[in-house]
């Protein structure tokens, strides 16, 4: 997919993302010797996890619409270099697990070259690949990797996976992996919907020590809830499942929420996370363009992505 959009000219102060982004294959990205601030978008082309989870399909096209929405955003800091992995990680012939492994390898490689990696789905099964990529890279840096997951989501995504992985099993898989390897499972979820998770899922989350906040309690949260997560971990996996937001803001999702949170309720928390000096990876999932109106869901998430990028690189817009 090509990046394109409005062109006001070519002076630095009127440039937009589509005018500066460099689309490269993985080998070219790994050969890049730029050591400054750099972002790499990685696309994950998958409906398979949602199909297995009996959800409504369409998220495989989410990343395309995100790129369209991101394309026209103005450049505020020319020191930030934008890159896009040319080919999406693609689920072929229903082989979800192979795609997750490929994604993990891509993420680990890009992180080894100090890219701020932004993964764009696709279904939320993207999270298993992203997390394992972060962990794989972290293991090359320390014998005691501390990876904290902060998820904005209406669901725990800790369903059984004895019949295979899907878009609702990732964090149970990660929990089991961590237990087996003796790694702390530090999973924190914001926006949980009381009626979108069974009692078993609540019980399972509690048994694994998951910290969660109901959507109805979002206004009670502050930096005080977020900063301890950032302080005790060296790597932060920030994952946003778009169905956390209210249906009027995010109609184009796999599982729309009539009592979802509002973007302005999340932005302060996201800013706190984005400003961390810890090693941050961002991931977004579950945009289903076929159910969207005027691309409002893609526009919302694109705005949040860019906000996180700019905040992470200390770019203030006056």
From Swiss-Prot:
GO molecular function: agmatinase activity; formimidoylglutamase activity; manganese ion binding
UniProt keyword terms in alphabetical order: Histidine metabolism, Hydrolase, Manganese, Metal-binding
HAMAP family membership: Formimidoylglutam
Enzyme Commission number(s): 3.5.3.8
Cofactor note as given: Binds 2 manganese ions per subunit.
Entry protein name: Formimidoylglutamase
Chain segments annotated as coiled-coil in the UniProt record: none
Binding residues annotated for Mn(2+) 1, in chain numbering: 124, 153, 157, 241
Lineage: Bacteria, Fusobacteriati, Fusobacteriota, Fusobacteriia, Fusobacteriales
Cofactors (names): Mn(2+)
Organism of provenance: Fusobacterium nucleatum subsp. nucleatum (strain ATCC 25586 / DSM 15643 / BCRC 10681 / CIP 101130 / JCM 8532 / KCTC 2640 / LMG 13131 / VPI 4355)
Pathway listed: Amino-acid degradation; L-histidine degradation into L-glutamate; L-glutamate from N-formimidoyl-L-glutamate (hydrolase route): step 1/1
Residues noted as binding Mn(2+) 2 in the record, renumbered to the chain: 153, 155, 241, 243
Catalyzed chemical reaction(s): N-formimidoyl-L-glutamate + H2O = formamide + L-glutamate
Record-stated family: Belongs to the arginase family.
Function: Catalyzes the conversion of N-formimidoyl-L-glutamate to L-glutamate and formamide.
């Amino acid at each position: 997919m090509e990046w394109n959009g409005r062109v006001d000219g070519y002076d630095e102060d009127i440039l937009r993302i589509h005018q500066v982004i460099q689309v490269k294959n993985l080998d070219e990205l790994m050969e890049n010797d730029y050591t400054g601030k750099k972002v790499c978008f990685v696309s994950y082309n998958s409906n398979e996890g949602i199909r297995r989870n009996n959800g409504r399909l369409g998220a495989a096209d989410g990343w395309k619409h995100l790129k369209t929405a991101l394309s026209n955003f103005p450049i505020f800091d020319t020191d930030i270099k934008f890159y896009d992995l040319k080919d999406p990680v693609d689920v072929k012939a229903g082989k979800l697990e192979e795609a997750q492994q490929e994604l993990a390898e891509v993420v680990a490689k890009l992180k080894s070259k100090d890219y701020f990696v932004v993964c764009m789905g696709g279904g939320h099964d993207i999270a298993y690949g992203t997390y394992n990529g972060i962990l794989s890279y972290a293991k090359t840096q320390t014998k005691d990797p501390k990876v904290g997951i902060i998820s904005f989501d209406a669901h725990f995504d800790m369903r059984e996976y004895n019949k295979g992985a899907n878009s609702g099993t990732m964090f149970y898989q990660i929990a089991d992996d961590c237990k087996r390897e003796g790694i702390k499972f530090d999973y924190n979820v914001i926006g949980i919907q009381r009626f979108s998770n069974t009692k078993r899922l609540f019980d399972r989350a509690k048994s694994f020590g998951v910290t969660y906040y109901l959507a109805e309690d979002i206004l009670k949260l502050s930096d005080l809830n977020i900063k301890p997560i950032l302080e005790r971990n060296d790597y932060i996996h920030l994952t946003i499942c778009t169905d956390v937001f209210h249906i009027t803001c995010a109609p184009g999702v796999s599982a729309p929420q009539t009592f979802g949170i509002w973007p302005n309720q999340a932005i302060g928390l996201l800013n706190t996370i984005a400003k961390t000096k810890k090693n941050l990876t961002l991931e977004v999932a579950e945009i289903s363009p076929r159910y969207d109106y005027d691309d409002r869901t893609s526009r919302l998430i694109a705005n949040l992505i860019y906000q996180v990028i700019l905040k992470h690189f200390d770019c203030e817009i006056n």
